[in-house]
């Protein structure tokens, strides 16, 4: 009796396993078929006789379909929406490059000073001056030692950048030998 029971249990287990595998394959094929139909038909999908089936298809298609341009995910302020094409996530719809920030007054004055002929030392990310630039600055400013400022009269702070556009224009329009708000000059000939 126990042998028959074990055989039946074994047969049921085998049949259940086979049924589970077959249903998984069938359901997987059905899901892929519905995904293709949802992508083709949009939100509503095909009409189904059963009301519950129609609601299920509608919810399924709503979940499966990619968001439209109007429903595209909002990007954070630091990212740019590169295209309005449908996408499934913000990472694919938004560019990873950050927005270009406006130049600071220090950078703007440094650019103006460089355009006016100043050979200011540039700085690396750690704030140190590039090697070899101070030598050029010393050679250029050596002839004007004691005249105040550097070769083109651009004021410098301790880090080598121009201070502000107002100080810059005042230093360029004034006498090279004057000592004003821009600080004392003539120290560049020695080099650092």
Curated annotation (Swiss-Prot):
The keyword Signal applies. It comes from the Viruses. Residues 140-192 are annotated as: Disordered. Keywords: Signal. Residues 1-24 form the signal peptide. This is Uncharacterized protein DR3. The gene is DR3L.
